[in-house]
Amino acid sequence: MKNIVLNETPVRTSKNYGINNIEIKDFEEPVIKEFKNIKITDNENCISSEKENINLKFGLGEYFLNQSNEQSNVDLKINVDKKLKEPIIIEYNLDKSNNVLIDNININAKDNTKANIIVIYKSADEINGYHNGICNAEIGANANIHVTIVNLLNTKINNFYSVNSNIEDESKSLFSMVEFGGKYNVVNYYAKLAGYKSVNKLHSIYLGKEEQRIDLNYITELYGEKTNVDIEVNGALKDKAKKNFKGTIDFKTGSKKAKGKENEYCTLLSDTSYSKALPMLLCTEDDVEGEHSTATGKVDDNELFYIMTRGISEKEAKKMIVKAKFNSVIQGIKEEEIQNLILEEVDRRLD
């Protein structure tokens, strides 16, 4: 076992805030073996099992990148060369025999393409486990790509995840992130808006319970003119769960008339849960627009009382409030079966 520091912010702030990175003490390296529990829905034959080493500008850290490149037990490449009519769905299920997953997903979306890609991580309730994953997306000009990553792992498995994307001229990308699982749930997201009028939306929800530790580090860099970034994050914490949110929008030289905004809101469902946030706007270009906000609060007593006057218990009323805050992200996923799966998990985890 060893101590490990990961998920560094692109610009450091005072150590007193305790948010520049996250330290995991007594980190235990996994024993990696074959992973067999994977289900793929790919009606248009876009997926192949192909190993490609990935380079990350940020990511979680050298240890996790090297592990993914050298020791992965699932490697998938998704080639999108047309406008797909049906979604691609990849589902990993961790169980007692498949409790260590090191997966790489490489998405290559060519110019003028369209795709809806959904990746789901699930697990049995009782197992300990380990997940280190990377999703890398190269999005060509005038493409329209929606990537959904759904983390429904239990609260005993350590979850480490990196998302990396490069977005070209006039392409539209939406990343929907559902972050519910993981004893440690540490996520690094990076998007490079390289092309003129490229758009990147990141819509994320998180839910923490028990003693979960959530560390979200979302970084976007705008290079192209008239690029647009929209980061919307909503979460809830109960029991002794703790969350760090770090959101960075960086306007690079040349990104004239670019726009970027980020908003994060955390609902505290207990007096022992804890939330920290660090929103950052960085800029080396004059003619841009940027805005950010973060807020943390408890459930509004008046709203809670109003719902309970309708004969609804306090627990069910809080579930309704949380699901209402999550609704826009869940509805944006489009696949009704996945929506219902997420809503059921909200109910189960808030019981």
Model-found features: residue ranges?
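Long, low-complexity, mixed-charge
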Residues: 1-73
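A generic "cationic amphipathic patch" detector
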Residues: 2-31, 91, 126, 150, ...
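Conserved beta-strand/loop scaffold segments within soluble protein domains that form the structured core
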Residues: 59-305, 309-312, 333-351
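Extended amphipathic alpha-helical segments enriched in small hydrophobics
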Residues: 306-328
